Amino acid sequence: AEDSILLGIEDVTERRILEREKDELLRQKDVMLEELQHRVANSLQIIAGIILMKAARVESEETRAHLQDAHKRVMSIAAVQAQLHASGAVGPIDVVPYLSKLCSTLATSMINDNRTITIKVVGEGGMATPREAESIGLIATELVMNAIKHAFPTDQADGRIVIAYEVDGPNWKLSVADNGCGRPDGTFAQTKTGLGTGIVKALAQQLGAKVETLADPEGTTVSITHATFLTRENRAA
C-alpha cells in the first residue's frame, strides 16, 4: 500500500491582521487612559492651587476655613486618583494595600508635627473594581479627615484612627474608628448634615451600602456596610 499524506492549508493572514489591530487598539486605549489620568491629576492640582490662593486673600476667617476644607477635599481626591493610577486602575484592586497607601499619604499631608495621631489600616483582603475602590477610598478619606479635624480638639498624646476592611463573599464592611472625643451616653450619633456627611452618604448609596455611626466616651466608629455583611461575631452566633 502506498503511504499517503494529507495536507491542510489555512490562510491565517486575516487572523493575524485582526490580532495586530486588536493589539493596537489596546495600546491606544492604554495611552488614552494614561493621558486622561494625567489630565485629571493636573486639573485637580490647578483647582487646589486656585482655592488656596483664594483662601489666602479673603478677610473672613469663616470663609477661609471653608476654602481650606475645600482644598483638603480636592487634594484627597487627587490622592485617591494617584493611588489608583499607581496600582494600574484597570483590573481588580486589592483594597487593603490600596487603603494603606492612601492613608499613609493622608497622614503625611494632614497631620502636622505638633499632633501625635497614628493611622492604621487592618483587614482580610478583598478585591474591588477600580470604580468601587475609588468610592471606598473617597469614603475612607472623608472619614479620616473628619476624625483628624474633630475627634482630637486638644493635643491628645495617643490619638489613633483605625480603618478596618472586612469581606464576606461579595459583601464587605468598611469602618473608621478613633479614640477621640465621643458621646457619653453611648448611643448612635445622628451625623450632622454637613458636606462631608453628604459625600459619605452619597458614595455609600452608589455602592449599595448603609452608613452607621456609634459614638461613646471611648471614641467614634463610622461603619459602611454593603448588603448583608455579617461580622465574624455575628456569623458565629
What are these regions (language model features)?
Residues 207-216:
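Glycine-rich ATP-binding loops of the HATPase_c
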Residues 10-24, 230:
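PAS-associated C-terminal cap
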Residues 2-11:
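PAS-family sensory domains
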Residues 21, 27-33, 37, 59, ...:
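Conserved short strand/loop->alpha-helix "switch" segment adjacent to the catalytic nucleotide/phosphoryl-transfer site
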Residues 68-75, 79, 92-109:
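Short beta-to-alpha transition helix within the HATPase_c
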